[in-house]
Amino acid sequence: ARGGVWFWPRQFTMNNFKEVFKDGSITTAYVITIARTVIGTFLSLMVTTLAGYALKQEDLPGRKLITMLITFTMLFGGGMIPTYIQYKNLHLLNSFWVYVVPSLVSVTYLLMVRTFFEGIPDSLEESAKLDGCGFFQTYLKIMLPLSKPVIAVVGLYTAVNHWNDWFAGAFYVNDTKLWPVQTVLQQMLTKAMNSQQEVTSVAQALAHNTVSVTSDSLKMAAVVVTTVPILCVYPFVQKYFAQGAMIGAVKG
């Protein structure tokens, strides 16, 4: 009997993608995902660079203690239940901001940014202060323009993390209209893999020599739908990526 697995596709079809976009919620999910990626990345870069520049100051009171406490959070986490309770007390559950606020600062990226700032000559900062620049003016006019490589790397990693995250939507948001695209597709794939109609549909498709949508083909279509948009961002930051990652790795 002829099987359903072929080395070459028997027929070109877009049915897999039609199945992915058949549910209108995918469009809303894309809007939520794009919004959380843009807003979350921008706010995260702002907070991370400000905190990194502050920790770079050698005259900051308790600088070593603050750094030690921040690093401590990399080794020990609070766990899911305490995190859920904390989000509930902060009124973040079932809210768009549950995607943004908890991920404002990543310790790894913070230390990377601080290390990069420490590599900038102090003479530039001192010259800015002699010209009358304060903390924020020096940060905006001196530090940020010189930090494009590390900002590009941190921004790309943060954007990818926001784009790929399905966990927050699945566990902290009950309103399906606030789900990101990853959560929607994860639920869609779960239903497709558990569907008892798949074997029947494949058998009918083989009998009529047509193309059927299976859980595997739907999974591959979902992978394309979710990865292509974020891949389009990479060429714009590629020239900064290697330089910034190398600096963070060598000096971190």
Predicted features by range, described:
Residues 1-252:
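A hydrophobic, multi-pass inner-membrane permease signature
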